[in-house]
Amino acid sequence: MVFFIAGYPKAGTTSLYDYLGSHPDVFLPEIKEPHYFTEDYPGAREVTTEDSYRGLYRDAEPHQLLGDASASVIHSGVAIDRICERNPQAKFIVLIRDPVAAVRSFHAELLHNLNEEVADFERAWRLQAARAEGRDIPGTCREPRLLQYWEIFDYRKQLPVFFNKVPETQRLLLVFEEFFANPRAGYRQVQAFLGLEDDGRSDFGAVNAARQHRVRWLAETHRKMVDGNGPMYRSLKSGISWLGIHPSDILARFNRKPGGKPAISAAFEAELREHFRPDVKTVEHLLGRRIEHWRH
């Protein structure tokens, strides 16, 4: 059986990937998000061929469930169809978060991975129309569609489609704030959904916490080192790799610091709350209950 931790970005998918990755009856590849089925976000895809995708699972044991934690699946317009055509019995786990908190955290993540360069989220939000037309795209952005923030967290459109396409027995929708208020209970729910025995996990520390670059141009240099892999980099890498040290890692660690979401004004937060109000209502309708954590 195969399963997908299908979304949403910045809603705990990395933590769940980490938890399930240590379960003896689960195999998750080292590449957390291959984005193989997300063909409408080509710049985000880490794996683009069938052979390469299958190769991610070559070390799986016959008894293990095979998982894919590409958080783009839920907001892609094609991924769920592609997956269901290939694996009609596939199961999907979707974590959802207060959309205002999620979109702000996603903006901070895009700043960190260099897909975004506008640190002021309000300005980045207002650039969406221009960017949809191909203007004001950062030179370091690998996939411009990621800059359409409202589109990534379009719960009102995406979740009803998801519910219609995937049978109830093959989908699990979890609320981020509730899951991490009692992660042990949430994790047991996930294990039961996947038909797994409890592995007894008791450590539920946060994974993929918010972070920032100290200096952006150093982050850009780091990406060029890794992507280009030129003669100077290869020479330096071969010279010190026997120590278990990689030059790109040294630079990345030096340039990394803990960081939260950039502050926004009360007026803009109120605007975001109003924008996402229909999305909150959609989620509550699908779950058949209020989500108190999202009420402001």
Q: Which residues make up each language-model segment?
A:
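PAPS-dependent sulfotransferase catalytic core
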Residues: 1-75, 82-93, 99-139, 166
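Aromatic-acidic/polar surface patches that form glycan- and anion
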Residues: 6-9, 46, 72-76, 147-155, ...
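A general structural signal for well-ordered secondary-structure junctions
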Residues: 26-27, 89, 232, 281, ...
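The conserved 3'-phosphoadenosine-5'-phosphosulfate
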Residues: 32, 160-270, 274, 288-296
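Short clusters of hydrophobic/aromatic residues that line enzyme substrate/ligand-binding pockets
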Residues: 37, 155, 291-294
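PAPS-dependent sulfotransferase catalytic domain
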Residues: 47-59, 116-203, 229
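Alpha-helical packing segments of well-folded alpha/beta enzyme cores
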Residues: 53-56, 79, 155-159, 186, ...
